[in-house]
């Protein structure tokens, strides 16, 4: 039934697009657009967001480790459907020298487990600019450190991105920040010093790390010889001290290179073997990322990144976890003892369940803007490869805006990998999703 629903929606959209193409060309009054832009610029406030509906179909890999963890007490069909509804609001109010910004996210989901609702305040902060070049902010915000597209190893404060959808908004952290900006003539054009205080208490950033500590972060930015450079540091008792560096430079008008480098002091990683014995590795975790973005004359965009995750598991450690799941699953099915499988499920909620828990990855994305002169249509193909075990995910997508403020995205994901590999042990073999997103501005 879900497949039929999605097919009918896509068919309706195609017929709608055909009607649009059949219409005569229309005239655009630029003066009306300019007046609308000016009216928007004169308002001290803004309020907008989007409404979203996203049906999804998941194809279950019943033999995979994460599938057996999720469904060990019940037999799940080979596919299941999920329906997602989302409301995103963001707004601001400005009255010099103060500004207020906020962003909320309300997500309602329905699947075989029933209905679930989650409302979050993504951002809400006050900004004070007493003089030119100085900004003081306090509240919940996203820091956006790092230059990587799919991963940001030098982003020590923000939550990690979803590499399969890295442009999606993230929930921020409660911080107090100060930004001081200076501009110069010569090779050094701009420098910015950012300082951050990150409190971690029971109801403030509680998941950030060890409670009841005030932590400190800082970033120094330079625009030097047309190259963006950042140097970061984070220290405090909630997390171990870490240092970072990133850069970005346009080698030509259509070729950009970027990179990140991060060191995490005294990083501890716990792993488990087939027998359930745990071991803890403590090290100076070194992570780095190198990438490029290339835009052709035909407006085809290529993004390529290599990510070395120093905080990830080795191939043997990931295989040890899978072996432990196998042993726990066998014990449950033969004796009814669910102790081991429940323990494995709890571990899967931590480091083992991260989007990319391994150590070496390649990210590739190619997108084509408006092929065949179809306005507001962008096909794309994304792939993430675990370079250690050879498993990967392939994500084709079609994005189209048939009318103003409406975005339609049809997307699939195909996961490929053998026994014991990262993508071979994910819960799903594939998924198909259709996202309808309507933007509004009040």
Residue ranges and their predicted role:
Residues 178, 364-366, 427-442:
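Outer-membrane beta-barrel "beta-signal"
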Residues 85-198, 222, 417:
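Outer membrane beta-barrel
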Residues 99-110, 122, 160-161, 193-201, ...:
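Transmembrane beta-strand segments that form the barrel wall of outer-membrane beta-barrel proteins
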Residues 23-136, 398, 407-413, 427-435:
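Beta-barrel outer-membrane channel/assembly domains of diderm bacteria
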Residues 39-40, 45, 53, 91-95, ...:
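Residue-level signature of outer-membrane beta-barrel architecture
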